[in-house]
Amino acid sequence: MASHGSSCGACKFLRRKCNRDCVFSPYFSYEQASSHFAAVHKVFGASNVSKHLLHLPQHQRNIAAITISYEALSRMRDPVYGCVAHIFALHQQVVTLQEEIEFLGSQMKNFSYSNQNGSQLNNIPEFVNQMTMATTNFVDESVLNNADGRNCYDGFFTNSEEMLVNHQWLQNMDYYY
């Protein structure tokens, strides 16, 4: 049951009494029922979501609720592509940055060849190779690991007591669309 005797966001949206066994209460707060749970209900249906959550082990329900909510909100914003649109945008950004690095590397090569005096940069091809490898490994390392060495998913899938709708990734979704 939601805190302070109030119903959870799902029960508020569905206009029913929230009891102790409510499968939605740990994941949908009362305050954002109209935005987050409304999208989940419209895209997937409350009955389907509750069945899926009940079939999962307790420790996986928070991750599933976050994923379902993210996908539902994405599908509401972009009915055709859903969350894949965000993935496409990030992929295009990586491709654009790789092209920019290649262009800047060729500019640096041209600069070093035009300045054939003794103090030129001798390691330009090595630098370009390092930069190319850095961008190709971007998704594997930089996106998945933050400065603390933790996986970025660890910051997203927090402890089960945190309300889903208060997570910063879901609050900042407008930034990406």
Curated annotation (Swiss-Prot):
Bridged cysteine pairs (disulfide): none
Domain LOB: 6-108
InterPro entries from the UniProt entry: LOB (IPR004883)
Entry-linked Pfam families: LOB
Induction: By auxin.
Tissue-level expression: Expressed in roots.
Residues spanning the signal sequence: none
Similarity comment: family membership: Belongs to the LOB domain-containing protein family.
Identification of the protein by name: LOB domain-containing protein 33
Species this protein is from: Arabidopsis thaliana (Mouse-ear cress)
Gene name for this UniProt entry: LBD33
